[in-house]
Curated annotation (Swiss-Prot):
HAMAP family: NusG. Transmembrane segments: none annotated. This is Transcription termination/antitermination protein NusG. Keywords: Transcription, Transcription antitermination, Transcription regulation, Transcription termination. InterPro entries: KOW (IPR005824), NGN (IPR047050), NGN-like_dom (IPR006645), NGN_dom_sf (IPR036735), NusG-like (IPR043425), Rib_uL2_dom2 (IPR014722), Transcrpt_antiterm_NusG (IPR001062), Transcrpt_antiterm_NusG_bac_CS (IPR015869). GO terms for biological process: DNA-templated transcription termination; regulation of DNA-templated transcription elongation; transcription antitermination; transcription elongation-coupled chromatin remodeling. GO terms for cellular component: cytosol. Belongs to the NusG family. It comes from the Bacteria.
């Protein structure tokens, strides 16, 4: 019976094929673990086995202490993505970093992400960044001007913000009566 090693199980490891893998980490330790992996790769001269290490984050503007500051939010807290050639040696390099709890997949064989899965992660990251950027543009009670649709040029007051759907509930005056309408973020602009 042959030994159950990654080199024996995964044919890709012999062809130097790099694929994306998900690594589970200790909470809040993603940056330190990424730096530790990069240091260990350089120290062990294994740069040929690794192509990229990503922490899926997006920038968000928040008000802290009365100032608008940019902070990073994690799309997948406690996870990092590594594009690597999975061999016994590269697996052990990552697995033995303090704070790494394991790869996604079985304990013996990590599961590589498919192209559609990795594309989905990148699309979600892009969408979250867009939502975060746009949702901070408007505040409840703010006066906005409708720029698109049947109520174009109407002015209204933001009543609610739905970040998940990229929509605002805006109260506009129609025939002297306040009427709530739902609009996309890109259908309004801040009034001067």
């Amino acid at each position: 019976m042959t030994e159950q090693t990654i080199d024996n199980i995964l044919p890709a490891s012999k062809n130097n094929v790099k694929q994306w893998y998900v690594v589970h980490t200790a909470s809040g330790a993603e940056k330190r673990i990424k730096e530790d992996i990069l240091r260990k790769i350089a120290k062990q001269k294994m740069t040929d086995f690794f192509e990229d290490i990503l922490i899926p984050v997006f920038g968000v503007s928040e008000v802290k202490r009365g100032k608008n500051v940019k902070v990073e939010k994690k799309l997948m807290p406690s996870y990092i993505l590594i594009k690597m050639n999975m061999t016994d040696k590269s697996w052990h390099l990552v697995k033995n970093i303090p704070g790494v709890t394991g790869f996604l997949g079985s304990k013996i064989v990590p599961k590589a992400l498919t192209e559609s899965e990795i594309q989905n992660i990148f699309n979600n990251l892009e969408a979250e960044a867009k939502v975060a950027k746009n949702s901070k543009l408007y505040e409840v009670g703010e006066i906005v001007t409708v720029t698109d649709g049947p109520f174009e040029t109407f002015m209204g007051t933001v009543e609610a913000i739905d970040k998940a759907r990229n929509r605002l509930k805006v109260s506009v005056s129609i025939f002297g009566k306040a009427t709530p309408i739902e609009l996309n973020f890109n259908q309004v602009k801040k009034s001067d």
